[in-house]
Amino acid sequence: MSRSEDLYARAQHRIPGGVNSPVRAFNGVGGTPIFFQRGEGAYVYDEDKKRYIDYVGSWGPMILGHSHPDVLDAVRQQLDFGLSFGAPTEVEITMAEKVCELVPSMDMVRMVNSGTEATMSAIRLARGYTGRDKIVKFEGCYHGHSDSLLVKAGSGALTLGVPNSPGVPADLAQHTITLQYNDIEEVKRCFSEIGDQIACIIVEPVAGNMNCILPVEGFLETLRKVCDESGAVLIFDEVMTGFRVALGGAQAHFGIVPDLTTLGKVIGAGMPVGAFGGKREIMEHISPLGPVYQAGTLSGNPVAMVAGLAVLNKISEEGFHQTLGTKADRLVSGLKQAADEAGVPFCVVSVGGMFGFFFTEAEVVATFADVQKCDLSKFKAFFHYMLEEGVYFAPAAFEAGFISQAHTEEDIDYTIEAAKRSFAKLV
């Protein structure tokens, strides 16, 4: 029995399902989840000391790679001053200033402790600001596990096959309108009928929780237009894309300015951090300035702030994202060529330091329906073949992959060669 198998058996006695987040349980691929002991650069090491090239990156935060010295040094220095005060600190201001500098649509920002908390708070703020109840989201997009947003959600909810989580009251879910991602005409119809009742649209500008789906031409522009016409708030959930697909996030990459933005993952460098912010006139409705309540004991935690600030300073260096994107392109083009040579139907996509792949005959995967048509059995087999080769992709077909600064050309070349061997086994 491997150390991971032993730990998983032990974990299931005290932790529901043996994990603290469902996608970690390997339900999407089968088998025993791997328990990791440490990470360094582009690599993670399991409890049996086996090394893997890591393309999960803690689901996105590790844009510099694991255990980056700048981040660790910043955290060590802060530890000498204390862990938490529940009071204002200067580093919170510095962090807020940096975020607003990098994301110009954010006049003000509020720090929280997770992406879920950020999206939940942004929704509440939009409702309070507009005086409306209804919200629009898109099928297959995941915005955390708050009740309003678990209707037809992506990510782990897709893996579990639970489109609407038990425990979400029907009278609450009725205020959530779910439309098809990338369906421009459906958006227009919805807003022509009830636009004056809608508080906000929340959207992943790149849908990273049903793998990696890019917006079709005109989709994000349409969202901006209908919100302008109806008075609804446009929220970009950039928990995943923020600082990753471009320094200014997906909004900078696509040139669309939202009213509110939610952030997480990269902003915390692996620490539990989220944030939401946007137009001053909207943000001034948040307590203590306004009546919309939001609070958190550990919000703006100084250890998390210094870690996040270290990452933001590093990724602000000239050429960082160009290099990141080049690495991702090299990886997915190599995977695609390997699949084609093996005769395996395969579709790839990448944007900035984020990528996805699908086992499908389709040349483009653009909707939730497209994702559902992909060959999950081939993905599961490929995942385990690659794991045996020492390459760790996301253990679910509905999750995006991530490149870090630490990945080398040699890492990528090895991954492609391992994929060639793995594809050969699928034929």
Swiss-Prot record:
Its main location: cytoplasm. The modification N6-(pyridoxal phosphate)lysine is found at residue 265. It is an enzyme of class 5 (isomerase). The keyword NADP does not apply. GO terms for biological process: protoporphyrinogen IX biosynthetic process. Pathway: Porphyrin-containing compound metabolism; protoporphyrin-IX biosynthesis; 5-aminolevulinate from L-glutamyl-tRNA(Glu): step 2/2. Its EC number is 5.4.3.8. PANTHER family: GLUTAMATE-1-SEMIALDEHYDE 2,1-AMINOMUTASE (PTHR43713), GLUTAMATE-1-SEMIALDEHYDE 2,1-AMINOMUTASE 1, CHLOROPLASTIC-RELATED (PTHR43713:SF3). This is Glutamate-1-semialdehyde 2,1-aminomutase. It comes from Marinomonas sp. (strain MWYL1). The lineage of its organism: Bacteria, Pseudomonadati, Pseudomonadota, Gammaproteobacteria, Oceanospirillales.
